[in-house]
Amino acid sequence: MEIALALKAVILGIVEGLTEFLPISSTGHLILAGQLLDFNDEKGKIFEIVIQFGAILAVCWEFRARIGNVVRGLRAEPLAQRFAANVVIASVPAIVLAFIFGKWIKAHLFNPISVALAFIVGGVVILLAEWRDARRGTVSHPQGNALLEAAKAGAPRIESVDDLNWRDALKVGLAQCFALVPGTSRSGATIIGGMLFGLSRQVATEFSFFLAIPVIFGATVYELYKARALLNGDDLGIFAVGFVFAFLSAFLCVRWLLRFVATHDFKPFAWYRIAFGIVVLLTAYSGLVSWHA
């Protein structure tokens, strides 16, 4: 295994793990990182699929107890059945639109300039959502008489993933459709969409994690099947390196984010998105970085 290639695998694995579940777009970062590292050929595309699989397995491991309880309760427990149904309902819209428009999106939007614009627009949307949240006087855990005041002010009406109904799940699923545009961020679309539809920040974040499992897992299996002719045993070493680093970095990131959202908003991510998008546009038009589609 070439050291330079292994280093690229490590970097891209970490980039995937750290960005997959933050509202900053893993796809956007991978497109840009792939351009900089000159690792965006057919092998690079397959590599991205593999490291995404590593990242989603980290979520499965973090929530293994909850997933196990849901699976065991599917036969007889209404709560588990409703939870599973909500995940399926929320997954359908994006899957359908991806099937219809997937080829067009890849042909026209998978380039650094489009990604940079999506970064900026997404950052502005997050700021507007947080501004709206603050203006409504939202509190995370109202108690006593504050409960009535919070309700009047428009506080989140859903404080637990188990309180979601199918309409809530469908709304979050529709929000997830915006993530088909590279640079938008799947987690950002589902979390901010969830908050706008009445979920607390913590519930929106947790449901976003669970929603990622069928969506990313299904996309991974489908893309690997399509690229099966390009799979080569000689690449297993590089794929394994990227997979491991994506898994580890994603696992740490998920744990950190769950703690972060308990006491912070998403404004730092919004400003990061805007700044990063502007930097990409400026370097592209000034010629400092040779971004190419």
Swiss-Prot record:
It is found in: Cell inner membrane. The gene is uppP. It is a multi-pass membrane protein. This is Undecaprenyl-diphosphatase. Catalyzes the dephosphorylation of undecaprenyl diphosphate (UPP). Confers resistance to bacitracin. One of its GO terms (molecular function) is undecaprenyl-diphosphatase activity. It comes from the Bacteria. Pfam families: BacA. One of its GO terms (biological process) is cell wall organization. Bacitracin is thought to be involved in the inhibition of peptidoglycan synthesis by sequestering undecaprenyl diphosphate, thereby reducing the pool of lipid carrier available. One of its GO terms (cellular component) is plasma membrane. Belongs to the UppP family. Its main location: membrane. It catalyses: di-trans,octa-cis-undecaprenyl diphosphate + H2O = di-trans,octa-cis-undecaprenyl phosphate + phosphate + H(+). Its EC number is 3.6.1.27. The chain crosses the membrane at residues 3-23, 43-63, 85-105, 109-129, 178-198, 203-223, 238-258, 269-289. Keywords: Antibiotic resistance, Cell inner membrane, Cell membrane, Cell shape, Cell wall biogenesis/degradation, Hydrolase, Membrane, Peptidoglycan synthesis, Transmembrane, Transmembrane helix.
